[in-house]
Each structure stands twice: as C-alpha cells, then as structure tokens.
UniProtKB/Swiss-Prot annotation:
Segments passing through the bilayer: none
KW NADP (keyword) present: yes
EC number: 1.18.1.2
UniProt protein name: Ferredoxin--NADP reductase
Native organism taxonomy: Bacteria, Pseudomonadati, Bacteroidota, Flavobacteriia, Flavobacteriales
Length: 351
C-alpha cells in the first residue's frame, strides 16, 4: 500500500506543480497517470509546441516546461504510479481514501487531487473513407509530436481552431508547403493567430482554402494527395502528410463513477474557497474542473493548485494556522535534505 498525504491523479503541469506547493507545506504527494511518462498532453501530444502565456517565459516549449516542472519538484521526492489509471475509490471512516488502479496498485491518501486535464483523450477523426489505411506512418497524423518530421514536406492541415492555426504558422517555417483547409471562412481561434495566418497567406507561406473540406485521399501505399471539395469544385492537392485537427474527445473514465457532480464532462467544484468537489477531501484542479468563469489555462491550474493545498493542510492539521512565508525570505527545504535560499545580505559599515 502506497501511503501519501495527497494523491494526485494526472501528471500534467497542474498535477506536477501541486507537488511543489504541497512540498512548501511539508505535505507528501504521489501521482497516478495513465501515460508512461509525466507531462500529460504537453509531453504526449505536442512537446515541441511553444507556449506564450506562462509568466516569466516569453516563449517556452511544452516539453521544456514539463522538464522544468519535474526539476522544480524533484526536491520534494514525489512518488509516481505511471502507465496505470485510477479505477476505484473507497472512503474510510476516518475520512481518508484508498484508490486502486486498473492494475491493482493501492494508494492510501488523506486527500485526492484530480488534475487529469481532459481525462483520457482521443482525437476527433473525420469520417472519411480509407482514413484508417493511411494512419500509422502512411501520411495521416492527428498530433504534431516532432515538427522535424515535416521538414521539407508538403503538409495539408484541416481545422478551424487554435491548434490548426498555430501548427499552420509553426510548420510554415519547416515544411516546403502548408495548406490550411477549413469548411468556413471564419476561424474560432486567437485573433493574433488568425491575423498571422492572413499575413503568411499574403506572403505566400501558407495556402488557405476556405470554405473547403477534405473529402478523400489518393496514394497506393501512403498519401500522395488529398481531394478537397470547394463549393461544387473538386480540387486535388499533392501532399506528404494530412493533419486533421478537430480537437480531442475527452473521457473521465472510471472517475465518472465516483459519485462526483459532473457537468459537461467536467467536475464541478467550489471555486469560492478551495476547488473541493461535492465529496469532502476530493478536489479537482486544472482543465478537468468547471465553475462559473472557468478558464482552461495552465496558469489558472497553477493558481487552483496553490489554493487547494492550503485547504488540504487545514484538513490534515485542523486548527493549526499556517503562516505564509515568501520563498525568497524563508528559502525551501527539500525532503531530500537540500536547501535553497537567497544569498544573504552582508551588513558592513563604510568608513
């Protein structure tokens, strides 16, 4: 039986940062994740994608952010149960929990922090004849894990959201040709991304086909071209890769059966205080939760994690007041015996 103060379900950025904030309060954490490595979507789906809204980083690659978070929490020695998913939960008489994974690993924790992002996820695939044939290195890619794979290649991207816009912009400097196809003239993405695509189109760096829709493929062993329906005209565009980016289908999995209050595939929480669910001792933070005014941003997940661990501290130490100290003043004592602190000022008289 694995013993811990906080059992975190999900090893994405929010789950990882929870370890740091909990460590400042001397709370131990253990993380369960269904993937074989920490990082969640950032590692599994787009490690090379730049993120622009992390404070202090004008730009940071998703994979690098995870690497930095893992380095940041190393001193607090979190445990990991990877390649396993949380399956069942039992609340004991003392208010603590036993969570058993799909492989039978048991975890005993005072509190549970569900930080599972979108839960388990799979891409929304377009309904096209023979698309399965072209999967598995034959030309159809649902994620961009390694942009270098597309260097000097002809790429057709289909979609109208942020991912389609962002990857069209990014790959325009790598691929020999980028064609962006969307069934509408209007895009549902960040305004600056839409304007950037317009700018790249004017510069001849991106071919834009709207309104248009990919309706078929050609190629005996791998994709050689895609057929695009534009109004009543069928156009054939040569390509090496077709990347349909229509979002992800989220699934909460077994967590949906834990008696939590669910709204539109997200877990309802009390955002007025501590992001606790309808079950005392179970919290939900990051993209997996919902409340009025919710924003699905990594930054917001960090904030939610910070407040959540304060609540867990009070739950474990009822009536004990925690005095907030700035890390620049107090320093950080790791569970591994290390200490980090600011350089001491030297007091010296001037004669």
């Amino acid at each position: 039986m694995i013993e811990t103060d906080i059992l975190i379900i999900g090893a994405g950025p929010t789950g990882l940062f929870t370890v740091f904030e909990a460590g400042l309060l001397k709370l131990k954490c253990h993380i369960i994740d269904g993937l074989p490595q920490p990082g969640g979507q950032l590692t599994e789906l787009y490690p090379k994608k730049p993120i622009f809204d992390i404070p202090g980083y004008p730009s940071v690659l998703a994979g690098d952010l995870i690497t930095n978070l893992i380095e940041q929490i190393k001193q607090f020695q979190p445990g990991f149960t990877l390649n396993e998913t949380a399956e069942t939960i039992e609340k004991l008489e003392d208010g603590t929990f036993i969570v058993t994974s799909n492989k039978g690993t048991k975890h005993h924790a005072n509190s549970i922090a569900i930080a599972g992002g979108l839960g388990s996820f799979e891409p929304r695939k377009p309904i096209l004849k023979d698309i399965e044939f072209y999967e598995n290195d034959k030309g159809v890619e649902y994620f961009v894990k390694d942009p270098e794979k597309f260097r000097d290649k002809k790429v057709v991207i289909s979609g109208g959201g942020d991912s389609a816009l962002d990857w069209s912009i990014y790959l325009s400097n790598i691929a020999s040709e980028v064609t962006l196809v969307h069934r509408r003239n209007e895009f549902r993405g960040a305004l600056d991304s839409v304007e950037k695509v317009q700018e790249l189109k004017s510069a001849g760096k991106i071919k834009l086909i709207t309104p248009g829709e990919v309706v078929g493929f050609k190629g005996s062993e791998k994709i050689e071209s895609v057929d695009i329906q534009v109004n009543t005209t069928l156009t054939t565009v040569p390509c090496d890769y077709f990347i349909p980016l229509f979002g992800l289908t989220p699934k909460l999995g077994a967590i949906a059966n834990w008696g939590l209050e669910i709204e539109k595939n997200a877990i309802k929480v009390n955002n007025a205080l501590d992001y606790q669910t309808n079950i005392e001792g179970i919290y939900a933070i990051g993209d997996v939760n919902t409340y009025p005014g919710k924003l699905k941003l990594i930054l917001c997940g960090f904030h939610e994690a910070t407040l959540m661990v304060q609540s867990v501290y009070q739950r474990i130490n009822p009536g004990k007041k925690y005095v907030l100290k700035y890390t620049t003043v107090s320093g950080i004592d790791g569970f591994d015996g290390t200490r980090k602190e600011a350089e001491k000022q030297v007091v010296k008289s001037i004669e």
